[in-house]
């Protein structure tokens, strides 16, 4: 065992006078650190952590202390002379003494700092003189350099190394990708461009992939359904002459939905129709299409605190028409023997959104363009003939007030293609009256009202009195109704068979303005405008000049008909095969759109969202708006 604790003057067993540092570098086979007095400055340069420790010769031979402590042992290792050196000789601080002089008592004392510095320099010089184990030059190559520098600097300029086979393939792929992208976004539009697409086309031959329901049903250039047969493209009206088809919907695409934004023309109602105290809730998920028909199904289903659920769709603020013919093929819901249901196919001015009572306040069912007692609340009649609050958008509204177009009386008149019911009073075979026969009421609703609600029947025509008769109900305190009831075939209900219903009409005043209703191919009755001409202190009321929307619904209400609860069965469905609109292209009074000249609606609707989007508001003031002032009642 070698005790390395001591000073540099300690002798080894083999050499009585050998320097401790030199002995560590005596041969190439053994390399170790010098472990000397930790207070010795020369020793601290080699190993600062040397302390009291005892090491075996085997440990020393293995190189304890590491490369940095021991340095390299090779043929150029410096072996100091055999004499003993002492960095701090005795008396080194006394007068006349030389700290680097040789002490006679210690054989000779020489400063070993130079030897130590040389030793450290050689330790970092590498195993061979002139070489460095820590090469910093790229020119020095080692056997594993290819892993780190696959392209030596001297070879970087060679094209074969710069590109290579793989690089060439990548370059070709990038060029192909760039060419394909350019072809897709530049070449393809150029190759497929066919020139200007005229909007005057009458047919839509293709739309898009059927997987995209909404996009597939969009129609550009024509509002005619591609599934409408060409034989239905024109119609010869008894009063209006030859008419051209301008809109149709055959409902042939299955699974259509009618939530807001789902359909180009139709919008499902989602509310309780409180205006007529209906028992059902109109749910927007109810209307759908299947087997070529629109289906409005009523279920005894608890929904929104009501016991029934059904469907209503409208074209409100999407599709409007003024003048022409509307034709609807339908099979009404319910049993032909049990009364109770209320199917409807009707139209109303676009300024009224069905079910939104604030929009109908002071607007429905006015068709009036005069400034007199007809615009006032209750028609200024103390007899209580009318409970209406007066025409809000009347002709004499002051300039600058809230009105779609000041100077024109505006309203929301209603024309019904049918309201399904059962009724007595309808002649059967000329003499027998049946209370359980299905009939349709075809009517026009007006305000202000005639005196005693009695129109001028000289301008009313009923074509077949064996199946049609004027309705005994002429209206109430909120509307005057000119209505004719016609009996139906029992098979025209519940999807068993379909029948056509609708009307032709020409807007305006005078004997040429009229409405003619029909069932199937037969006209049932006609009302010419003078039937609601001037009467008492009320001026003439024109046939609706407002842009009209289409409404299809299937309801149940105690205000419409008496029914027997225990005999009603559910579910019941109303089916609609198609809706078609015809107009005379040469007639300036016939317009397809919601903003015909002199009767705009869309801007006014957009400016009053609190009324047109909130069905909980039941009056114009409740929606947060003020009735406009007029010269007759307020002065301007």
Swiss-Prot record:
The record's GO molecular-function terms, alphabetically, read: glucosidase activity
**Which terms does the UniProt entry file under GO BP?**
(1->6)-beta-D-glucan biosynthetic process; cell wall organization or biogenesis; fungal-type cell wall organization; sphingolipid biosynthetic process
Its recorded name reads Uncharacterized beta-glucan synthesis-associated protein C17G6.11c
SUPFAM superfamilies this protein is in?
Concanavalin A-like lectins/glucanases
Which family does the entry's similarity section mention?
Belongs to the SKN1/KRE6 family.
Q: Which residues are glycosylated?
A: 291, 378, 429, 464, 489, 616
Q: Which residues form the GH16 domain?
A: 218-587
List the source organism.
Schizosaccharomyces pombe (strain 972 / ATCC 24843) (Fission yeast)
Which ranges make up the Cytoplasmic topological domains here?
A: 1-170
Q: What does this protein do?
A: Required for synthesis of the major beta-glucans of the yeast cell wall.
The cross-references to PROSITE patterns, in alphabetical order and at most eight, read: GH16_2
Listed A to Z, the keywords are: Cell wall biogenesis/degradation, Endoplasmic reticulum, Glycoprotein, Membrane, Signal-anchor, Transmembrane, Transmembrane helix
The membrane topology of this protein is: Single-pass type II membrane protein
Which parts pass through the membrane? Answer: 171-191
Pfam families according to UniProt:
SKN1_KRE6_Sbg1 (PF03935)
């Amino acid at each position: 065992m070698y005790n390395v604790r001591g000073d540099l003057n300690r002798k080894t067993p083999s050499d009585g006078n050998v320097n401790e540092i030199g002995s560590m570098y005596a041969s190439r086979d053994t390399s170790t650190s010098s472990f000397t007095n930790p207070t010795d400055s020369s020793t601290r340069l080699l190993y600062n952590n040397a302390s009291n420790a005892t090491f075996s010769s085997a440990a020393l031979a293995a190189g304890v202390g590491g490369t940095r402590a021991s340095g390299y042992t090779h043929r150029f290792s410096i072996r100091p002379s055999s004499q003993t050196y002492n960095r701090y000789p005795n008396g080194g601080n006394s007068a006349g003494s030389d700290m680097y002089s040789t002490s006679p008592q210690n054989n000779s004392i020489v400063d070993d700092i130079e030897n130590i510095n040389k030793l450290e320099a050689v330790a970092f010089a590498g195993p061979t003189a002139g070489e460095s184990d820590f090469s910093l030059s790229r020119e020095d190559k080692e056997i594993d350099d290819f892993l780190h520098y696959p392209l030596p600097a001297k070879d970087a300029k060679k094209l074969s190394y710069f590109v290579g086979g793989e690089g060439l393939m990548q370059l070709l792929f990038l060029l192909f990708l760039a060419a394909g992208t350019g072809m897709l976004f530049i070449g393809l539009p150029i190759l497929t461009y066919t020139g200007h697409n005229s909007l005057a086309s009458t047919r839509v031959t293709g739309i898009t992939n059927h997987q995209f329901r909404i996009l597939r049903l969009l129609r550009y250039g024509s509002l005619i359904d591609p599934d409408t047969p060409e034989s239905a493209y024109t119609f010869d009206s008894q009063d209006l002459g030859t008419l051209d088809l301008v809109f149709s919907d055959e409902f042939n695409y299955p699974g259509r939905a009618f939530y807001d934004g789902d359909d180009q023309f139709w919008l499902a109602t989602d509310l309780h129709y409180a205006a007529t105290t209906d028992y059902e809730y109109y749910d927007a998920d109810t209307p759908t299409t299947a087997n070529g028909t629109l289906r409005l199904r009523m279920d005894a289903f608890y929904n929104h605190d009501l016991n029934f659920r059904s469907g209503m769709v409208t074209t409100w603020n999407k599709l409007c028409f003024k003048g022409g013919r509307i034709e609807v093929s339908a099979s009404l819901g319910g049993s032909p023997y049990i009364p109770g249901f209320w199917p409807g196919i009707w139209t109303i001015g676009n300024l009224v959104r069905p079910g939104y009572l604030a929009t109908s306040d002071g607007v429905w069912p006015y068709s009036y363009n005069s400034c007199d007692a007809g615009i006032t609340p209750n028609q200024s009649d103390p007899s209580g003939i009318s409970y209406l609050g007066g025409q809000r958008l009347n002709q004499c509204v002051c300039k600058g007030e809230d009105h779609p177009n000041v100077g024109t009386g505006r309203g929301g008149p209603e024309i019904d293609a049918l309201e399904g019911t059962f009724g007595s009073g309808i002649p059967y075979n000329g003499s027998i009256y049946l209370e359980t026969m299905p009939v349709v009421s075809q009517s026009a609703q007006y305000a202000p009202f005639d005196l005693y609600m009695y129109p001028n029947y000289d301008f009313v025509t009923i074509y077949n009195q064996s199946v049609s008769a004027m309705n005994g109900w002429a209206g109430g305190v909120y509307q005057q109704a000119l209505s004719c009831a016609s009996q139906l075939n029992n098979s025209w209900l519940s999807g068993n068979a379909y029948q056509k219903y609708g009307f032709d009409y020409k807007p305006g005043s005078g004997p040429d303005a009229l409405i003619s209703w029909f069932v199937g191919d037969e006209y049932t009755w006609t009302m010419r405008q003078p039937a609601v001409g001037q009467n008492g202190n009320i001026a003439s009321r024109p046939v609706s000049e407002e842009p009209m929307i289409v409404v299809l619904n299937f309801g149940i209400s105690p205000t419409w008909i008496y029914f027997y609860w225990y005999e009603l069965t559910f579910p019941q469905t109303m089916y609609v095969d198609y809706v078609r609109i015809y107009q005379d292209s040469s007639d300036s009074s016939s317009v397809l759109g919601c903003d015909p000249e002199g009767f705009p609606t869309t801007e006014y609707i957009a400016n009053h969202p609190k009324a047109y989007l909130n069905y909980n508001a039941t009056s114009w003031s409740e929606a947060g708006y003020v009735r406009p002032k007029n010269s007759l009642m307020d002065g301007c």
